Design a protein with these regions (language model features):
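Divalent-metal (often Zn2+) His-rich catalytic cores of metallo-beta-lactamase-fold enzymes
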Residues: 132-139, 149, 161-261
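Short acidic-hydrophobic surface loop/beta-edge motif
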Residues: 6, 18, 100-105, 125
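Divalent metal-coordination and catalytic microenvironments
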Residues: 18, 30, 56, 68, ...
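Active-site HxH/HxHxD metal-binding segment of metal-dependent hydrolases
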Residues: 11-12, 23-26, 31-114, 128-130, ...
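Active-site metal-binding loops of divalent metal-dependent hydrolases
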Residues: 31-32, 57, 83-84, 118-119, ...
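Histidine-centered catalytic micro-motifs
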Residues: 52-62, 114-122, 186-194
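Active-site-proximal beta-strand elements of phosphoester/diester hydrolases
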Residues: 2-7, 17, 27-30, 109-117, ...
Length: 266
């Protein structure tokens, strides 16, 4: 298996290139708009990118899924969450994914888990490697649902949605991933410095077991107290977040070109 984490300082963005070296198939998770590094690394490793995945509709940076697909002459399938309903449907995507769906990338199996809370449509990908053990999960791409030392903030869609999303986040943390074993590694979409969480740790990966033991997000308490602790002292979100989320929902224009099929923001 080939695994590469690409980390962009400043906004502290983490994206991933994962591939099966025997079959040459690969997948990119949550790409940024600067797509050349993914293409260069894939070429160096003799990989061809089969899927481009988004864990959710990002609010802090322009997602590079369309840019990457275009640079690959359309030879990659863009997969997004199908749990967003009419408000958060991404019309440019080739495929919508739902809870329990699986993607095959050579010997690698990526299973979809719907983990709402940071956003309504948020999904995570649990990865198994059949060349090692087809029954045991190895790691998980958690997007902005679960960070090192933190969880994704539930207040980015405004006051009307904040409490609903916070309740969903509680269920995602204590129910949806409860059966995953402690040894599962987590690879989030952000590190320390991102405003997509309140107190994200400085490491760029962890394990579920470690987070369950030390993270404030996993401390057992009542639902009401957990949500109260989550929301207190939450920093203000940047003013561009809501606009950016809509751009990523509709599909950002390709760099240096015009895309008439995309709903452009005023």
């Amino acid at each position: 298996m080939f695994f590469h984490q690409r980390f962009v300082p400043g906004l502290a963005i983490a994206s991933y290139l994962l591939g099966d070296e025997k079959t040459g198939e690969a997948v990119v998770v949550d790409p940024t708009r600067d797509v050349q590094p993914y293409i260069d690394i894939a070429r160096e490793e003799n990989l061809h990118i089969k899927y481009i995945l988004e864990t959710h509709i990002h609010a802090d940076f322009v997602c590079g899924s369309l840019e990457l697909q275009n640079s690959l002459s359309g030879h990659a399938t863009i997969c997004v969450s199908g749990h967003g309903g009419a408000d958060w449907k991404q019309p440019f995507a080739d495929r919508e994914l739902s809870e329990g769906d699986r993607l095959e990338v050579g010997s690698l199996n990526l299973e979809v888990i719907h983990v709402p809370g940071h956003t309504p449509e948020h999904i995570a990908f649990v990865v198994k490697d059949a060349s090692r053990n087809s029954d045991k999960p190895w790691f998980m791409f958690t997007g902005d649902f679960l960070f090192v030392g933190d969880v994704g903030r539930p207040d980015l869609l405004g006051e009307d949605e904040k409490q609903k999303l916070a309740n969903q986040l509680y269920d995602s943390v204590f129910d949806k991933i409860a059966k995953l074993p402690d040894y599962v590694e987590i690879f989030p979409a952000h590190g320390a410095g991102s405003l997509c969480g309140k107190a994200i740790g400085s490491r760029n990966s962890s394990t579920l077991g470690y987070e369950r033991r030390v993270s404030e997000a996993f401390k057992e308490t009542t639902r009401e107290k957990w949500i109260e602790t989550l929301l207190e002292d939450m920093p203000l979100s940047p003013s561009y977040f809501q606009r950016m989320k809509k751009i990523n929902r509709d599909g950002p224009a390709l760099l240096g070109s015009k895309r008439h099929s995309v709903s452009r923001m005023p």
